[in-house]
Amino acid sequence: MIIRRLTNEEIPQACELARGVYEIAIRRNFPGGESHAFFDEYTDEERLCTEAAQGQLFMWGACEGNMLVGVCAMTIQGHITMLYVHPLHVKKGIGKKLLRKARIFARMELKLQQVSVNAVPAYTAGYFRKAGFT
């Protein structure tokens, strides 16, 4: 398993993974609602590529061989905006490794003291607490 920064060329693949996980884990279980429209708008590949090219957004991927199995995105302000792991690869510590990589980058490269996240849906709050978020 390799955790590394994604290139702009890989952002569409990261969005595809995020959309697939969202469909399975969230949209099917929580039909309707504004959060779906927000997610659909947020995962606009062109916008994400532009933000990444401008240095406003950073993305990491967890790769097993040639397959992207997890993705994490963080803004230049240190806010985690995306954390998705393929359902066949959960419970392997991939999310924690992605978060750790983002936190180290925030501290070392962006010189930030803390990283933030909004746990959506709410049932993910326990996961983020265990990962050190308050």
What spans do the regions from the language model cover?
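Conserved active-site alpha-helix within GNAT-family acetyltransferase domains
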Residues: 96, 121-134
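Conserved beta-strand in the GNAT
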Residues: 61, 67-84
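Residue-level recognition of the GNAT/N-acetyltransferase active site
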Residues: 75, 86-90, 118-120
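Conserved acetyl-CoA-binding loop-helix of GNAT-fold acetyltransferases
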Residues: 85, 91-104, 130
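A short helix-loop-beta-strand connector motif used in the catalytic cores of GNAT acetyltransferases and
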Residues: 43-60, 79
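Conserved GNAT acetyl-CoA-binding A-motif
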Residues: 106-120
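Conserved GNAT-fold acetyl-CoA-binding loop/helix
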Residues: 19-47
